[in-house]
């Protein structure tokens, strides 16, 4: 499978790459340079670049969005919400049926996430609260 990974140099990137690299063709993208030990295809790309994400996803079978930004309101919105829009737009434009978007599990259940003890299910109502990261990821999920 040909996979586009958005935001791939962050915390989850190395684990996802390790799990996929031997069986799939990966294009890693991020605004930061890849780790020195990464020997695959890399493109410098911001997840909120709608045209850039659409172009990078051409010919791909799957898009995985690992992007995250927490420290600035506008940038968090651009990355988590507009970035998700860019990903979904690219999937629709290029007829990509497999899309994975990562985000905090507590955007589903708010600050009471400890009470669920990891038992997340589709019937859980979203409760992102007012925390910047959870709220911006929740808005992205709504797209």
Predicted regions and their residues:
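N-terminal Rossmann NAD(P)H-binding glycine-rich loop of SDR-like oxidoreductase domains
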Residues: 3-23
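SDR active-site strand-loop-helix element
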Residues: 6, 29, 63-67, 99-105, ...
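Conserved glycine-rich Rossmann-like NAD(P)H-binding loop of the short-chain dehydrogenase/reductase
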Residues: 24-35
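NAD(P)H-binding glycine-rich loop region in Rossmannoid oxidoreductase-like domains
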Residues: 34-35, 45-82
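Conserved acidic residues
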Residues: 40, 61, 97
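Short alpha-helix in the Rossmann-fold core of NAD(P)-dependent oxidoreductases
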Residues: 77-84, 88, 100, 136-137
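Conserved Rossmann-fold NAD(P)-dependent oxidoreductase catalytic core, especially the SDR/UDP-sugar
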Residues: 86-130
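Active-site Tyr-X1-5-Lys
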Residues: 128-143
């Amino acid at each position: 499978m040909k996979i586009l990974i958005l935001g791939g140099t962050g915390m989850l990137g190395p684990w996802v790459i390790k799990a996929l690299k031997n069986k799939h063709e990966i294009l890693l993208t991020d605004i930061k340079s890849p780790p020195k030990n990464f020997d695959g295809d890399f493109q410098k790309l911001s997840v909120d670049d709608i045209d850039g994400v659409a172009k990078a996803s051409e010919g791909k079978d799957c898009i995985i969005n690992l992007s995250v930004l927490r420290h600035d309101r506008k940038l968090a919105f651009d990355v988590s919400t507009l970035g998700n829009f860019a990903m979904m737009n690219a999937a629709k434009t290029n007829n990509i049926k497999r899309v994975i978007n990562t985000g905090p599990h507590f955007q589903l259940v708010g600050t009471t996430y400890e009470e669920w003890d990891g038992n997340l299910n589709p019937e859980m109502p979203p409760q992102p609260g007012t925390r910047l990261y959870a709220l911006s990821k929740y808005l992205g999920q709504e797209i």
